Amino acid sequence: MKVVGLTKKIMEHLKEPITIKELAKKLNMHPKNLDVKIRVLRDLGLVETKKGRNGGVRLTKEGLYLLEKGEITLGSLKLQIVAKDRIGLLADITSRISKIGGNITSTVLEREGDEVIIYLVVENVDKDEIKNTLEDVVEKISILW
């Protein structure tokens, strides 16, 4: 998924909360036309809307991630991770993956002595970014597919 054209312009203005009316004025668009685009972004989970006096629209964490990256792959990576077993290891790994916008769809953990082998299927992450994110926590990380 790439962020280009009008979608990119809209998302660039949504780093901070803003009303549809204010955003439409900035983009020189009719608010009703903009509202249609905002609803699509909301349905994709890229923006959140809030009604009322202090309402408006702004990017979600996922929307900010997509805008920053400019493109995400909707494919999955299967990872094999080897690490020294310790309390909180899996929580540490999964929270780091979550912080870079990854979504874990499958987890299998095997223990061999004082080491664990963890197999993860992860969506929405770049293979180099995930390796950099986990390098100080694990002994070895392999991309299986």
Swiss-Prot record:
GO terms for cellular component: cytosol. One of its GO terms (molecular function) is DNA-binding transcription factor activity. Gene3D superfamilies: 3.30.70.260, Winged helix-like DNA-binding domain superfamily/Winged helix DNA-binding domain. Residues 78-145 form the ACT domain. It comes from the Archaea. GO terms for biological process: regulation of DNA-templated transcription. This is Uncharacterized protein MJ0241.
